[in-house]
Curated annotation (Swiss-Prot):
The keyword Membrane applies. Residues 30-89 form the 4Fe-4S domain. Binds 3 [4Fe-4S] clusters. This is Ion-translocating oxidoreductase complex subunit B.
């Protein structure tokens, strides 16, 4: 009795899977190619420094709501020019609040972990969206400055407040 029920549900699941995959090709979800192109340019760090929950919502806001293209701090000025090229924007205004436009450089951040207070819980490393924090549990962790975007997410999850961010 139980084998027949399992067999019936297995066959039913298989048939529904085939139907769903067939429906996917008949009614494809059409994505805006411009949004996808802008999203591909963004660094995908999901750091939320732009005020959006991730890179795709920010790309969607840029294309649909004419959001400023200079809010992505990890992307820097080069990203701003690439997005402007995709959107055919001719006059780009520099935003000195978010980017260091005069030197064509990103605002650099240095993240320091205090060795005395770090307990090696690895919470900062597990929440880092760009994997810039390395270390093993119960030992001191370190930050790879080259990859750190300064998003402050590690600060929120550190139980001992041993992480300091210095913006230069």
């Amino acid at each position: 009795m139980s084998i027949t029920i399992i067999l019936i549900f297995s066959i039913l699941s298989f048939l529904l899977g085939i139907i769903l995959s067939y429906v996917k090709y008949i009614f494809p979800i059409k994505k805006n190619s411009i949004i996808a192109e802008v999203d591909d340019l963004l660094p995908q760090s999901q750091c939320a420094q732009c005020g959006y929950s991730g890179c795709y919502p920010y790309a969607k806001a840029i294309v649909k709501n004419n959001e400023n293209i200079d809010k992505c701090i990890p992307g820097g000025n080069n990203l701003k020019f690439k997005i402007a090229k995709v959107l055919n924007i001719k006059n780009i205004k520099y935003s000195l609040d978010n980017l260091n436009a005069k030197n064509e450089k990103n605002i650099h951040t240095t993240v320091l972990i205090d060795e005395k207070n770090c307990v090696g819980c690895s919470k900062c490393a597990s929440f880092c969206p760009v994997d810039a924090i390395i270390g093993t549990p119960n030992f001191m962790h370190t930050v790879l400055q080259k990859f750190c975007t300064g998003c402050n997410i590690c600060l929120l999850h550190c139980p001992t407040n041993c992480i300091k961010i210095i913006k230069e």
